[in-house]
């Protein structure tokens, strides 16, 4: 850019337009502060849809505007309150100077550790880490979702370990595992797996070891809440055994390493087959023992039933004999009763009026058909009826 100095008519003091003086300052800034490091605390963080990140760096006395252009890869994730050292250069925009950030590192771990402890306590009080809300892993998942970097040793180790233990379908959702976009990409991956019509049975979130800065994205509060809200069980495998992040507490299970995560998720096929064979042998032996016991029991029951059968047959024969005797006695008794009744009937027949009439007797009745048994009941001119064996006649007493 060419700068032309305009002379004032009043004196020799140079005169600039706003654009010119801004250009001079821009050039001065770029030439003087083309590569600097500025230490301060991030505040006023803003992420518009453009993908650029706007924030301010402040210390106890001053504030400077800063911007990180979309596409700049940083190891540290932006977070209000972080104390960082930003590498970049100064630039002038709209008559204001700002720091263009090209790299960023953590300034110290003391404040970070305090922030992490505070977040952990907050989520713990909410019950986010409670064992009661953790989901059990499926016994033998046939589909495993893996959220990790598509390159590097981690994904290779996981796939290799899956093949060794129990070959299963592995669906990889590639993400960045460090830097400013890491936590957002992991959140998107977890939500994406949960939205599948045929989702994986378990999810492994993994990355290899790294510095405190490298692992910082996995201390994100929104990520921890997303992990806890997942309907699919999640195993966290971040860093090495001594590395702990917030999602390790929010996950349903924590593995010390990515390969250890596979070992928690999948049983070893050879051991599983051996265990099944052992259980089969035990079951077979137990079944054979039960069969023999039942055979012995059936034989005993057969013997008992045979004895009972013979006893029942004997009792049946005795019962039949008693039945025949009872039938005979009943017949004899009935015959005697019949004879007795016949004799009674014969006796009664002698007292029947017809029988009496048949031997020459007569029955006398008055005009009211009342039987007369004494002459004293009769008077002269009384009309009577005389019944004989072969008929009746009327008569008058004279």
Curated annotation (Swiss-Prot):
An example molecular function term from Gene Ontology annotations: exodeoxyribonuclease VII activity
UniProt KW keywords: Cytoplasm, Exonuclease, Hydrolase, Nuclease
Record flagged with keyword Cell inner membrane: no
Record InterPro entries: Exonuc_VII_L, Exonuc_VII_lsu_C, OB-fold_nuc-bd_dom
Gene Ontology BP terms: DNA catabolic process
Compartment list: Cytoplasm
Pfam families linked to this entry: Exonuc_VII_L, tRNA_anti_2
Top-level taxon: Bacteria
Catalytic activity from the UniProt record: Exonucleolytic cleavage in either 5'- to 3'- or 3'- to 5'-direction to yield nucleoside 5'-phosphates
Annotated protein name in UniProt: Exodeoxyribonuclease 7 large subunit
Organism: Anaplasma phagocytophilum (strain HZ)
Gene this chain is encoded by: xseA
